[in-house]
Amino acid sequence: MDPEPSLEIASQVDFTLAFGFIGIVILLFCSAIVSGAEVALFSLSQKDVEDSIQENNSKGKIISELLEKPKKLLATLLVANNFINIGVVILFSFIGKNIFEAIDSPVLKFTIEVILVTFLLLLFGEVLPKVYASRNNIKFAQLVVYPIAVLDKILSPISIPMREVTVFLQNKLGKQKTNFSIDQLSQ
């Protein structure tokens, strides 16, 4: 006897929703790692890096190597985070069709999806990891250094040209103004 078609469709929907939710959780975790890494790595002082090298030679050296090219590292982190966040939005849109199917108005459905996905991305992909990383920068940097180093290698074909364009634009648009010294202000 064949299974009833309505049960088969329901199990496919449940299966799709489950994988969609799992995918969103994984991508939000990846976004948290990348966002936290940005804060943790760029808030390290030179002494923190040196202490990290002394404490854990391999992780400390990788942290130091990554920070030798800060613009490339920043480009890598921003590109990775954008790819991840786009993935979250696409997956959420995909499962949102099933979750919000009872809502007839496409405008209302779209508005709810945008508000929910924005909330999830901001809270779990940006704010919480950055707060944690700023309070535990050395620990967080050492925790994420290997995945970030892999990302840095994988995304080099994108981040290096981005860095070059950024430097070119900075040179064309003018140098950053320096701060005035106390002597200059007193004159």
Protein language model regions, located:
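Membrane-embedded alpha-helical segments of inner-membrane proteins
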Residues: M1-Q187
